[in-house]
UniProtKB/Swiss-Prot annotation:
Residues 1-27 form the signal peptide. It comes from Rattus norvegicus (Rat). There is a cross-link at C970-Q973 (Isoglutamyl cysteine thioester (Cys-Gln)). GO terms for molecular function: brain-derived neurotrophic factor binding; calcium-dependent protein binding; endopeptidase inhibitor activity; enzyme binding; growth factor binding; identical protein binding; interleukin-1 binding; interleukin-8 binding. InterPro entries: A-macroglobulin_rcpt-bd (IPR009048), A-macroglobulin_rcpt-bd_sf (IPR036595), A2M/Complement_sys (IPR050473), A2M_N_BRD (IPR011625), A2M_TED (IPR041813), Alpha-macroglob_thiol-ester_cl (IPR047565), Alpha-macroglobulin_TED (IPR011626), Ig-like_fold (IPR013783). This is Alpha-2-macroglobulin. Its main location: secreted.
Length: 1472
């Protein structure tokens, strides 16, 4: 009995099928009307969609209504569709816009006189999304470069959208917004933008973040790093995979220059198989098995070798299943090294079988066909081998042979398969049955495939042949359809109509029919339909082909076709020619759909080697689609569909005395399942489902309950989507060559003429084009080879000191296929002496891929930048090169390179500036300029110039990024690069002198300054001098207030993230005490602000000024309490003995002026007037303990920072009066301005940072208050007692123009005369050098070198510099100090050793700038600070001169010390 029961269970699927076939049907019954409506289960709001209607066997006119129902109400899609005969038709409709995704009911109602059909089901309606992407001009940037980028928006058909972009910003690695654009419209579907990086940005990964109109966020990454572009590429070629049985593998390494030529040099290759859990405790084997190879590269720049795999123990477990290959090439001659790597996977799979192009379902009566692929462990097909294929259900067991592609085809007869599944097995060889602990055994992988039956009550089937390959666009696909029909089910039908739909990107895009004639006895066969593959079907097309039989059964099949990611706008890009010499012209032709807007880009391949990027490609564009292929029902639209067909009763049946019971079989697929897999919702009264077995309760004695469960088929195989000349002179070396927008003409062509840059490299160019007709198109990447058949490179130091000698080397490289005879010549110049180091030859032979170096011993004679011009020319010579006759190339037969060398005078450079403000007012005014020099001046080092400007801010405007000849490496100093731009813009705006050029430059400086300042921000919103560094994380109250007011004032010109302002203000408010004053946090780098007991008042006054300057009202709680603190302090100081510090008074006067308290301001100004230093035509203020000035000086030195700052605050107080300063105020201000302008340096700045910011603010305010347009030009005449004379004119049109003349004789006396109207600002700059001399300095500096002598052989090329620094001045300690160590000529600092200095508690920061090392010291006391770092030889120099070390107080420039040092081998030539 048990045996019979098991057998009965096995036959259950067959019995159910038999029972269903025996159900009573009436073949002669009249056919009922059939209604079928299909619509995608996912709809897009605002985008045209399609629904397809099929009405068959209509016997009356019907009206069709389609609507969408949601909680927001009903929306009718069709109301006027009336059908009176059979119809197959697809109609477009548009779902109204929606602000969010929403599940809705899609309802279909068909109503006639006697029939009514109504069905509804859920669909998901997604809100409309645009496809937005960004493109940067390159993937990686250096500090200080400009990031250029484009934003593009498309609809889902890839047509351009001129949408509004609400927000776009740049985010740095610390998540700061450093630039922002709001509410801008795209034009032609795109917008091109740019922003400059600061010179010291946070390095790392940045993002362009785009907020679309729908609220979606799109990001595009790029990197900012300090890097040197690779000179050549190291290509490592290794097998992708090897098996554990292989005994050797080939390793190949090639070095290729970016211009495509081989690299000469030596390669070192390391091949390792690492241990999975490495340990340093058990020898090298517990880390990795490694093999090292080293060899000279051949003439092709390559190295190749067969490597034995035995040493890598491929069969051992516990080691990684891969070999890591690292290669390093050292270039011959230069020692430049570049690296490359490769990876080889290890597999124990020796052979592998897989099924190809097989269906997931079979249909009884239609052969089941497919292919089996046999590959080896590397994935390479194995041809002409015998494999076994078996299928138990079909009683099939055969051997077959693979073809030349490793494929074996099979066909299985399904006529006698009675079950619901078919399992096919493919086998090649048995795997090794051995097993060893810690050893790998080889395996031969078999293949299995199970296909499930398709359900049809009439046993009628349709099968679409699948295709193995991805289809090309613009081809016609012939789809083969195989059918088998039940003759009885066809009744008397003469023809059968097959209907088909094609879906792509989640929507219905095509529909059609095929009529099949029917003949008795011919119910089995095949036919084909033709489908044109176009862009509307990409990237995945799904086809459903079906027919409705007379009995209402739907028979059909679906197929999926992958199509290449093609775009309708065909874009091509061509360089003519595609290679050329530097500085020649080339034509870039763009071909696209007429009137397309095209974005062009060409980048140096070296950049892409540095950081490979994912090129803009069709696949990336298709990845933007919200739906590439709709499968199944989306979440929310996956409810169980209603089934009106009822169920089959579970009547027991006895066959041969055995009890059988029908059960639901879940493996068979019906038509409903096929349509659901395509994501189609179907509303029909036809038969598309297999019958459902009625549920029946059973007691425990029956068949186990598990057999009654109905499995719901898979629902959520959801959406594939992605949110996520003859002679050349070379000097121009960009990283991005082309970044342009062009519009093609009506013929679809645009031509751009370009000049080839001087970089010898391969340029990679691409274009995308946007057309309103055809949409987006992408060009293939094209190359332009910028190359010279031979060229010359120079090797020389950055700078030398006059009197030193060096070797100038010129290397000529030949890449012609023939030999050339080259003459190398150094152009003579009066600026240097040069002699060949070898016996001079007229010419040299250089054959293919060879090089020749010529060298000269050079002694510079002139100071400044000295140009060296070297040319290499191919000669027309009959003299043989070996056995070859040298040739002369048609192009590029001569290459000339010009490089400059800085020749500096001996000693230490000084600069003295004399300033005058001359206002003729209709009468002539004159002034004597007496240029004197100290007795110890270095010969020929003196030079002088006079600058004439019509505006007191003119010099500062020209030099806003170079106001001080000092470093800008901390958070305070950076602000002198930022804040003055605000005052310049304000002043020029108010005086209506602002030009677009000045505005653009100033805003760029503000943007970079903003970025840089964020480096010094703390997490709590405060700022400190050197940022949030471990051990130096004390926030600075004073600097935070400075940044806060500057950011607030800059908001009207650039984007400043409000977060930074809000956080800084909150942090400052937390530092306010109960009495309204502010507590100090962090060190003050300028201790002139430390006024003893007045520290708190001075700081509070400064913060109050900052809050008022950022336009906070006096009623603001923080401001109100701060003013209370200041008022209390002033009343206390006024009534007490000794009064208040001048510096504090100046701040108080300006603070009360800003607060509108004019009475208190006047009271303080009156007190200050009593302490003023009044000279003949000027007024200023000094500190009581002002450091004394050396009597040895022959000129009046520039005033210290504190004097300038306090005097500028007094000027601001005079000028801050409502509604405007009085004439009395302006008269007093004029005297202050005359003194201030005399203190300016040659760049328009002052002594230090804070005084420069405050003084320029005050001068700009004075300029605005007194600005008038002169009716008559001012004439300036400068003449000497000799023959020199020159004239300038200053008028309203050129008053911002900087006019300069070099004075011919120094020393000497010159007279300046000014006539006409208006004021003229005159500035004389005198520069000279003096030798360091022994004298008393406020700092003590001792410099030593290790080793101290040249006895150590290493001293020729490397030595250590040791500094011992202490402060011996009048104060207890200095302000922040800078140690400026100049390099000995030919030597460069070893950067890691300089960076290590920052570990010292005394060192806040280090910089390497050209041939100087700058060390920032928080302060220096009488305790000696020891610092040391290492330098190494870069270029050998003879007769080395000593170099100078200067230590100076950043805020008291008169406090400094100098010392000199020499290289251990100063008089030796080193290794030359």
């Amino acid at each position: 009995m048990g045996k019979h029961r098991l057998r009965s269970l096995a036959l259950l699927p067959l019995l159910l099928r038999l029972l269903l076939l025996l159900l009573p049907t009436d073949a002669s019954a009249p056919q009922k009307p059939i209604y079928m409506v299909m619509v995608p289960s996912l709809l897009h709001a605002g985008t045209p969609e399609k629904a397809c209607f099929l009405f068959s066997h209509l016997n009356e006119t019907v009206a069709v209504r389609v609507s969408l129902e949601s909680v927001r109400g009903n929306q009718s899609l069709f109301t006027d569709l009336v059908v009176d005969k059979d119809l197959f038709h697809c109609t477009s409709f548009t779902v109204p816009q929606s602000s969010s995704d929403e599940v809705m009911f899609f309802t279909v109602q068909v109503k006639g006189a006697t029939h009514e059909f109504r069905r509804r089901s859920t669909v998901l309606v997604k809100k409309k999304e645009s496809l937005v992407f960004a493109q940067t001009d390159k993937p990686i940037y250096k500090p200080g470069q400009t990031v250029r980028f484009r934003v593009v928006s498309l609809d889902e058909s890839f047509h351009p959208l001129n949408e509004l972009i609400p927000l776009l910003y740049i985010q740095d690695p610390k998540n700061n917004r450093i630039a922002q654009w709001q509410n801008f419209n795209l034009e032609g579907g795109l917008k091109q933008l740019s922003f400059p990086l600061s010179s010291e940005p946070t390095q790392g990964s940045y993002k362009v973040v785009i907020r679309t109109e729908s609220g979606r966020t799109v990001e595009h990454p790029f990197s900012v790093e300090e890097f040197v572009l690779p000179k050549f590429e190291v290509r490592v070629t290794v097998p992708e995979t090897i098996t554990i049985l292989e005994e050797e593998m080939n390793v190949s390494v090639c070095g290729i220059y970016t211009y495509g030529k081989p690299v000469p040099g030596r390669v070192t290759v390391n091949i390792c198989r690492k241990y999975s859990n490495p340990s340093n405790c058990f020898g090298e084997e517990s880390v990795a098995f490694c093999e090292k190879l080293s060899q000279q590269l051949d003439g092709r720049g390559c190295f190749s070798q067969l490597v034995k795999t035995k040493s890598f123990q491929l069969k051992r477990q516990e080691y990684e299943m891969q070999l890591d290959v690292h290669a390093k090439i050292q270039e011959e001659g230069t020692g430049v090294e570049e690296t490359g790597k490769g990876l080889t996977k290890i597999t124990r799979t020796i052979t592998k079988l897989s099924f190809v192009n097989v269906d997931s379902h079979f249909r009884q009566g239609i052969p089941f066909v497919g292919q089996v692929l046999l590959v080896d462990g590397r994935g390479t097909p194995i041809p002409y081998e015998t494999i076994f294929i078996g299928a138990d259900e079909a009683n099939l067991y055969i051997n077959t042979t693979t073809d030349k592609h490793g494929l074996a085809r099979f066909s299985i007869n399904t006529d006698d398969i009675m079950g619901t599944s078919l399992t096919v097995r493919a086998k090649y060889k048995d795997s090794n049955a051995c097993y060893g602990f810690r050893w790998l055994t080889e395996e031969n992988v078999e293949a299995w495939h199970t296909a499930y039956a398709v359900f049809s009550p009439s046993r009628s089937f349709l099968h679409l042949e699948s295709l193995p390959d991805k289809l090309r666009c613009d081809q016609t696909l012939e789809v083969q359809a195989h059918y088998i029909l039940n003759g009885e089910a066809m009744q008397e039908l003469k023809e059968l109509v097959f209907y088909y739909l094609m879906m792509a990107k989640g929507g219905i895009v095509r529909a059609g029919t095929h009529v099949l004639p029917l003949k008795q006895g011919q119910m089995r066969g095949h036919f084909s339909i033709l489908i044109s593959m176009e862009t509307d079907l990409a990237p995945v097309a799904r086809l459903v082909l079906y027919a409705i039989l007379p009995n209402g059964e739907v028979v059909g099949d679906t197929a999926k076709y992958e199509i290449e990611n093609c775009l309708a706008n065909k874009v091509d890009l061509v360089f003519r020619p595609n290679s050329g010499l530097p500085a020649t012209r080339a034509l870039l032709s763009v071909m696209a759909s007429p009137q397309s807007l095209c974005g062009l880009r060409a980048v140096d391949q070296s950049v892409l080697l540095m950081k490979p990027e994912t090129e803009l490609s069709a696949s990336l564009i298709y990845d933007l689609l919200p739906v590439k292929d709709l499968t199944g029902f989306p979440q929310g639209a996956d409810q169980r569909e209603e089934d009106t067909n009822g169920c089959v009763k579970q009547n027991d049946t006895y066959i041969n005395g055995i009890l059988y019971s029908p059960v639901q079989n879940t493996n068979e697929e019906d038509m409903y399942g096929f349509l659901k897999d395509m994501g189609l919702k179907v509303f029909t009264n036809s038969n598309i489902r297999k019958p459902k077995v009625c549920e029946r309760l059973r007691d425990n004695k029956g068949i186990p309950a598990a057999y009654h469960l109905v499995s719901q088929s898979h629902m959520d195989a959801f959406l594939e989507s992605s949110e996520s000349p003859t002679e050349t002179r070379r000097s121009y070396f960009p990283e991005t060559w082309i970044w342009d927008l062009v519009v093609v003409d009506s013929a679809g062509v645009a031509e751009v003429e370009v000049t080839v840059p001087d970089t010898i490299t391969e340029w990679k160019a691409g274009a995308f084009c946007l057309s309103n007709d055809t949409g987006l198109g992408l060009s293939p990447v094209v190359q332009f080879q910028a190359f010279q058949p031979f060229f010359v490179e120079l090797t020389m130091p950055y700078s030398v000191i006059r009197g030193e000698a060096f070797t100038l080397k010129a290397t000529v490289l030949n890449y012609l296929p023939t030999c050339i005879r080259v003459a190398v010549q150094l152009e003579a110049s009066p600026d240097f002496l040069a002699a060949p180091e070898e016996k001079e030859q007229r010419s040299h032979c250089i054959c293919m891929n060879q090089r020749h170096t010529a060298s000269w011993a050079v002694i510079p004679k002139s100071l400044g930048n000295v140009n060296f011009t070297v040319s290499a020319e191919a000669l027309n010579s009959k003299e043989l090169c070996g056995n070859e006759v040298p040739v002369v190339p048609e192009q590029g037969k001569k290459d000339t390179i010009i490089k400059s060398l800085l020749v500096e005078p001996e000693g230490l450079e000084n600069e003295v500036t004399f300033n005058s403000l001359l206002c003729p007012m209709g009468a002539e005014v004159s002034e004597l300029i007496a240029l004197k020099l100290p007795s110890d001046v270095v010969e020929e080092s003196a030079r002088a110039s006079v600058t004439v400007l019509g505006d007191i801010l003119g010099s500062a405007m020209q030099n806003t990024q170079d106001l001080l000849k000092m470093p800008y490496g901390c958070g305070e100093q950076n602000m002198v690069l930022f804040a003055p731009n605000i005052y310049v813009l304000d002043y020029l705006n108010e005086t209506q002198q602002l030009t677009q050029e000045i505005k653009t430059k100033a805003i760029a400086y503000l943007n970079t300054g903003y970025q840089r300042q964020l480096n010094y921000k703390h997490r709590d919103g405060s700022y400190s001098t050197f940022g949030d560094k471990p051990g130096r994380n004390h926030a600075n109250t004073w600097l935070t207030a400075f940044v806060l007011k500057s950011f607030a004032q800059a908001r009207k010109y650039i984007f400043i993230d409000e977060v930074h302002i809000t956080q800084a203000l909150l942090w400052l408010s937390q530092q306010q005490k109960d009495n309204g004053c502010f507590r100090s946090s962090g060190s003050l780098l300028n201790n002139a602000m430390k006024g003893g007991v007045e520290d708190e008042v001075t700081l509070s006054a400064y913060i109050t000024i900052a809050l008022l300057e950022m336009s906070l009202p006096v009623t603001h709680p923080v401001v109100r309490n701060a003013l209370f603190c200041l008022d209390t302090a002033w009343k206390s100081a006024r009534g007490g003995a000794g009064g208040s510090h001048v510096y504090t008074k100046a701040l108080l006067a300006y603070a009360f002026a800003l607060a509108g308290n004019q009475d208190t301001k006047k009271e303080i100004l009156k007190s200050l007037d009593e302490e003023a230093v009044k000279e003949e035509d000027s007024v200023h203020w000094t500190r009581p303990q002002k450091p004394s000035v050396s009597v040895a000086l022959w000129y009046q030195p520039q005033a210290p920072s504190a004097e300038v700052e306090m005097t500028a605050y007094v000027l601001l107080a005079y000028l801050t009066t409502e509604p405007a300063p009085t004439q009395e105020d302006l008269t007093a201000a004029m005297l202050i301005v005359k003194w201030l302008t005399k203190q300016q340096n040659s760049h328009g700045g002052f002594s230090s940072t804070q005084d420069t910011v405050v003084a320029l603010h005050a001068l700009s305010k004075y300029g605005s208050a007194t600005f008038t347009r002169a009716k008559k030009a001012a004439q300036v005449t400068i003449h000497s007692s000799g023959t020199f004379s020159t004239k300038f004119q200053v008028n309203n049109n050129n008053q911002l123009l900087l006019q300069r003349v070099t004075l011919p004789t120094v020393p000497g006396d010159y007279t300046v005369k000014v006539t006409g109207e208006g004021c003229v600002y005159l500035q004389t700059s005198l520069k000279y050098s003096v030798l360091p001399r022994e004298e008393e300095f406020p700092f003590t500096v001792v410099v030593q070198t290790l080793p101290g002598t040249c006895e150590d052989p290493k001293a020729h090329t490397s030595f250590q510099i040791s500094l011992n620094i202490s402060y011996t001045g009048s104060r207890s300690e200095s302000n922040m100090a800078i140690a400026d160590v100049k390099m000995v000529s030919g030597f460069i600092p070893l950067k890691p050793t300089v960076k290590m200095l920052e570990r010292s508690v005394h060192v806040s920061r280090t910089e390497v700038s050209n041939n100087h090392v700058l060390i920032y010291l928080d302060k220096v006391s009488n305790q000696t600070v020891n610092l040391s770092f290492t330098v190494q030889q870069d270029i050998p120099i003879r007769d080395l001169k000593p170099a100078v070390v200067k230590v100076y107080d950043y805020y008291e420039k008169d406090e400094f010390a100098v010392a000199k040092y020499s290289a251990p081998c100063s008089t030796d030539y080193g290794n030359a």
